[in-house]
């Protein structure tokens, strides 16, 4: 077996889109039961890792508003140390591009990339299933980013089934508002009883982009007018525009990259707009088996 590397640079942490998001119930502990399709896209944060012999975990980049001890990346690394007894530490640098509170899984994806990269950097060779169980302790979306491919998700988001999705390029708009997820889920007006979906309702067909809805969207639009305005603007170009996660990002799929780019080029300057291609697999999927 080859020896573990001493550094891993340019490790991507891709964003996700929820192609639909249905709230189908609520557990006794208050967690909401969901059904969704997760789509990976090529809009990414980038992380760099250097192995340390002294066991320390050092975040070498500052993230405004996120102390190192509260950073999911550091928490993920600390959890991996605790679970394995690993004596190594790491210097960790993060190039942050994905907006926080955007509904695209930025923090969860960063944590998953940390688990995948440190699993290799520290020579731990933990299987994917073990990493996913650790990831669930950090957040409900983290297991998906460790799963390695697009998925139909159930439960609180941790019960995952692989799904093949049609190629698409997405226009993603961040209306530059931060949406705290608990604020949306705790709203009395939230729909919590959407009928259950079965995966055969959308076998790898274009229908998946038009299927269902995001049950969180109506609440977010009511609370954040900028989300409603961004959706109205994007619907000029696609009837499939919808919100991802609990917001604030909205998106629409396009068959052709040139078509998507033409729309992205017109996004009003007060918002952040970009094109992002759909991915079939996580870029670091090979880091675990």
From Swiss-Prot:
Give the residues the record marks as binding ATP: 99-109
Q: What is its EC number?
A: 2.7.1.148
Q: Name one Pfam family in it.
A: GHMP_kinases_N
Keywords, A to Z, come to: ATP-binding, Isoprene biosynthesis, Kinase, Nucleotide-binding, Transferase
Q: What pathway, per the record? A: Isoprenoid biosynthesis; isopentenyl diphosphate biosynthesis via DXP pathway; isopentenyl diphosphate from 1-deoxy-D-xylulose 5-phosphate: step 3/6
Source organism (scientific name): Ralstonia nicotianae (strain ATCC BAA-1114 / GMI1000) (Ralstonia solanacearum)
For the protein in the UniProt heading, the enzyme class is transferase
Q: Which gene encodes it?
A: ispE
Q: What is this protein called?
A: 4-diphosphocytidyl-2-C-methyl-D-erythritol kinase
Enumerate the catalysed reactions.
4-CDP-2-C-methyl-D-erythritol + ATP = 4-CDP-2-C-methyl-D-erythritol 2-phosphate + ADP + H(+)
Active-site residue list: 16, 141
**SUPFAM superfamilies recorded:** GHMP Kinase, C-terminal domain, Ribosomal protein S5 domain 2-like
Functional summary from the UniProt entry: Catalyzes the phosphorylation of the position 2 hydroxy group of 4-diphosphocytidyl-2C-methyl-D-erythritol.
Q: Which family does it belong to?
A: Belongs to the GHMP kinase family. IspE subfamily.
Molecular function via GO: 4-(cytidine 5'-diphospho)-2-C-methyl-D-erythritol kinase activity; ATP binding
Q: Which InterPro entries match?
A: GHMP_kinase_C_dom, GHMP_kinase_C_sf, GHMP_kinase_N_dom, IspE, Ribosomal_Su5_D2-typ_SF, Ribsml_uS5_D2-typ_fold_subgr
Q: Name one GO biological process term.
A: isopentenyl diphosphate biosynthetic process, methylerythritol 4-phosphate pathway
């Amino acid at each position: 077996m080859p020896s573990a590397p001493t550094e891993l640079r340019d490790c991507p942490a891709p964003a996700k889109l929820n192609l639909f998001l249905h709230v189908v119930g609520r557990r006794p502990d208050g967690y909401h039961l969901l059904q969704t399709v997760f789509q990976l896209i090529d809009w990414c944060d980038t992380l760099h890792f250097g192995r340390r012999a002294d066991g320390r975990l050092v975040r070498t980049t500052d993230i405004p508003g996120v102390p190192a001890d509260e950073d999911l990346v550091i928490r993920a690394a600390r959890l991996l140390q605790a679970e394995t007894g690993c004596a190594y530490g790491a210097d960790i640098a993060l190039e942050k591009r994905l907006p926080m509170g955007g509904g695209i899984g930025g923090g969860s994806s960063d944590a998953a990339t940390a688990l995948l990269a440190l699993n290799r950097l520290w020579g731990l060779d933990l299987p994917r299933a073990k990493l996913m169980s650790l990831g669930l302790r950090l957040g409900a979306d983290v297991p998906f980013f460790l799963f390695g491919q697009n998925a139909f998700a159930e439960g609180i988001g941790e019960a995952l089934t692989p799904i093949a999705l049609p190629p698409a390029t997405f226009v993603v708009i961040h209306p530059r508002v931060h949406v705290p997820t608990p604020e949306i889920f705790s709203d009395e007006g939230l729909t919590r009883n959407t009928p259950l979906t079965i995966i055969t309702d959308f076998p790898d067909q274009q229908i998946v982009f038009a299927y269902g809805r995001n049950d969180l969207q109506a609440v977010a639009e009511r609370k954040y007018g900028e989300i409603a305005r961004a959706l109205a603007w994007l619907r000029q170009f696609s009837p499939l525009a919808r919100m991802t996660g609990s917001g604030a990002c909205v998106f629409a799929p396009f068959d052709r990259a040139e078509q998507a780019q033409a729309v992205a080029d017109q996004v009003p300057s007060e918002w952040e707009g970009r094109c992002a291609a759909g991915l079939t697999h996580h870029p670091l999927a090979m880091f675990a088996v």
